[in-house]
Amino acid sequence: MLVKTIPATEGWDETSDTFVSTPEITLTLEHSLISVSKWESKWKKPFLAQDNKSNEELRDYISCMTISPTNIDPMIYRTMPVNIVNEIYEYVNDSMTATRIVSNKKGRQQSPEQPTSELIYYWMIQCGIPFECQKWHLSRLLKLIEVCNAKSEIGRASCRERV
């Protein structure tokens, strides 16, 4: 979980051709499977894909990550200072774990399949991971799936071929 205080701002909104001001607000954010699922249902594409996302898509993901408060003026996300956006994305990209998996398979190729929230839910089911883990930082959840896959018994269907 990440808590960020967004300072009050005043500026020109080019969309509405008006001066706007936003109050200082403290956001509680979580990069989780729930936030990825919300974002994918709006944008209809995999969040974890390696493609470049627009500024609008990236800032919208921050709104999907917001746990509290609710009913936030969308202008807060549009006027959020770049340094705070960068801090949020450092948090998103943090592994949140000390666990490392060393593959002993030579020449192992990664699956070309792009993970979506539905696919990650499937992996959770296959691995027997409880749904309450959907609230975890996404990197931790993906690492747990990778650990389950690495520890799975020989002959058992793999929870996930690629993390």
Sequence positions of predicted segments:
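A short, structured beta-strand/loop element
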Residues: 55-64
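Conserved small/polar residues in nucleotide/adenosyl-binding loops
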Residues: 157-163
